[in-house]
Amino acid sequence: MARSPVEPPASQPAKRAAWLRAELERANYAYYVLDQPDLPDAEYDRLFVELQRIEAEHPDLVTPDSPTQRVGGEAASGFTPVVHDKPMLSLNNGFADEDVIAFDKRVADGLDKATDLAGTVTEPVEYACELKFDGLAISLRYENGRFVQASTRGDGTTGEDVTENIRTIRAIPLTLKGKRIPRMLDVRGEVLMFKRDFARLNERQRAAGQREFANPRNAAAGSLRQLDSKITASRPLSFFAYGIGVLDGADMPDTHSGLLDWYETLGLPVNRERAVVRGAAGLLAFFHSVGERRESLPYDIDGVVYKVNRRDEQDRLGFVSRAPRFALAHKFPAQEALTKLTAIDVQVGRTGAITPVARLEPVFVGGATVTNATLHNEDEVRRKDIRIGDTVIVRRAGDVIPEVVSAVLDRRPADAQEFVMPTECPECGSRIERLPDEAIARCTGGLFCPAQRKQALWHFAQRRALDIDGLGEKIIDQLVEQNLVRTPADLFNLGFSTLVALDRFAEKSARNLIDSLEKAKHTTLARFIYALGIRHVGESTAKDLAKHFGSLDPIMDAPIDALLEVNDVGPIVAESIHQFFAEEHNRTVIEQLRARGKVTWPEGPPAPRAPQGVLAGKTVVLTGTLPTLTREAAKEMLEAAGAKVAGSVSKKTDYVVAGADAGSKLAKAEELGIPVLDEAGMHTLLEGHAR
């Protein structure tokens, strides 16, 4: 069903109502029949409320087939239609506390409950409260305790026969238990998929190379409406009973809560997250309690449901149009909404990660007004085909950062622009680089970039780096936020008067920090390299670089081929080191650190190149515990013979020396057919080299 023509303005109510009806019907068809919802709930609700308002203001515009007069879509071909003996109606919705208070007032008035002079209800109504599941509504028919038929809600009057598929759901009893078994019982409830089961299902889909489901609701609906019940049987579906249709041969419980208690005695699954409360205050307390726990629930819900508890009071209140007067669905703030994407900027993280960020026309979603949403990375923007000018679906759940889920392609304007990742950092102008096989692009100005300033300073001061005692995160925050320190070099310009002026920084603390900074000026080359915070360069690699080159300048000027000669440095690490020193901003900060004797270290000649021999150019991996040699001693012997000692096994590994308790490295070597030596074999190899 194609999307409706151009949206008419509100000043033309007849055309506007016709457009709204067509748009809602199209959305209903996608939701109920195709199981491919393409309109967020909040947008559907907004359009539905607008149509209700227009029809209330212009009764002559109401049509018999208006969505306000019925519930949802048609039966899909391939399933036998089932006419419900008692219609499966939807509920009126409430979105704010005021809607709940108004509902309680209407109910109290309808039941002639006592009120005071101010109109406040003094005889509170008793309500049954339960969760509103985000699944698929169904009706189960039992005859003399045996399950005989299941049908979907469909349009509320006619649904689809899904009996064989429902039989596969283990949570649904095929035979009722207990003593009060009715001749006929229609159980109303919801088929859903728990979050953990949804995650496992998508894992299976990925492993099989099949399409993943967008959310548990889509997975449940798609599973239930399979023509092949074997597919349904393989899907982890669940069920909760919450209502009743036809009942014959047994007494109807006096209350709704009593009905659910009776269902439990019959062996039907009933959700335990329910309560009986009194008045609007009780309803709102239940709503807010559930809202606080919503994210931790094992299944998705989109609100709670209130029902007048006493059956006789339900009968007195009756129904209006498409919904009962005695019930209300109180929805949580929508987690998805439509809005326009006006621009895509990039944001620089503390580690230099470049993240595309969508700038949005303000939209209320997930309980807050959202104007920005993450696009994660460049690949995600391409995969989702999101462009500037698109109408997009934005999702915000709980405290999760808002994200753009997808673009609404048939609303894309002709002038929509594709996103182009910038080549320079917007914060500092340094080059943006993206290493092979990495999804994240990064700013290369690690020592200079304002966005990375706090992280760079914190790493620089670490105990294993320059070990600047007393320079913690809170002090760094103050120094950066007061613009006292921009780069690590600025730390060594800090004076006593500057430090004592900081919040909660006593004279003794200031003197101690100045002493630590003075001490940090005398370090080692390995510590200094590590302190620079070069991506992928840890303590061990920093030591290997210092040992191999002997001084800093050769490292800064080394081409990638020269870096690859360093022990344990592979292509990714070599590329990262090369990029760091190729960025002029980083070199400037390093020169500032070295200028006027600020930071010094003893330098020496580069490590002697290993003599040529059987191990020259060979890569060896050590694993396990050797009988007589420590790992370090064995490494020195191998390197002296010209070998490169690596930390992991790959196709480029020439030998693996294995001792006791060798683990995955030994297994990998055997899998790749790499020669494995014990300590004696290593000595034999070295002796062969010596000769």
Curated annotation (Swiss-Prot):
PROSITE patterns found in the cross-reference section: BRCT, DNA_LIGASE_N1, DNA_LIGASE_N2
Record GO terms (molecular function): DNA binding; DNA ligase (NAD+) activity; metal ion binding
- Keyword DNA damage in the entry? The reply is yes
Which residue positions are annotated as catalytic?
Answer: 132 (n6-amp-lysine intermediate)
Where does the record locate the signal sequence feature?
none
Q: Listed GO cellular component terms? A: cytosol
Its EC number is 6.5.1.2
One GO biological process this protein is involved in is: DNA repair
Which is a Pfam family this sequence falls into? HHH_5
The positions annotated for binding Zn(2+) are 425, 428, 443, 449
Give the matching InterPro entries: BRCT_dom (IPR001357), BRCT_dom_sf (IPR036420), DisA/LigA_HHH (IPR041663), DNA_ligase (IPR001679), DNA_ligase_AS (IPR018239), DNA_ligase_CS (IPR033136), DNAligase_adenylation (IPR013839), DNAligase_N (IPR013840)
What sequence ranges are listed for the domain BRCT? 610-691
Cofactor(s) needed by this chain:
Mg(2+); Mn(2+)
CDD domains for the chain: BRCT_DNA_ligase_like, LIGANc
The UniProt annotation places NAD(+) binding at 41-45, 90-91, 130, 153, 190, 307, 331
The catalysed reaction is:
NAD(+) + (deoxyribonucleotide)n-3'-hydroxyl + 5'-phospho-(deoxyribonucleotide)m = (deoxyribonucleotide)n+m + AMP + beta-nicotinamide D-nucleotide
Q: Where are the transmembrane segments?
A: none
**UniProt KW keywords:** DNA damage, DNA repair, DNA replication, Ligase, Magnesium, Manganese, Metal-binding, NAD, Zinc
Keyword Iron in the entry? The reply is no
Q: What class of enzyme is it?
A: ligase
Instruction: Give the family from UniProt.
Output: Belongs to the NAD-dependent DNA ligase family. LigA subfamily.
What functional role does this protein have? DNA ligase that catalyzes the formation of phosphodiester linkages between 5'-phosphoryl and 3'-hydroxyl groups in double-stranded DNA using NAD as a coenzyme and as the energy source for the reaction. It is essential for DNA replication and repair of damaged DNA.
Protein's name according to its UniProt entry: DNA ligase
**Species of origin:** Burkholderia mallei (strain ATCC 23344)
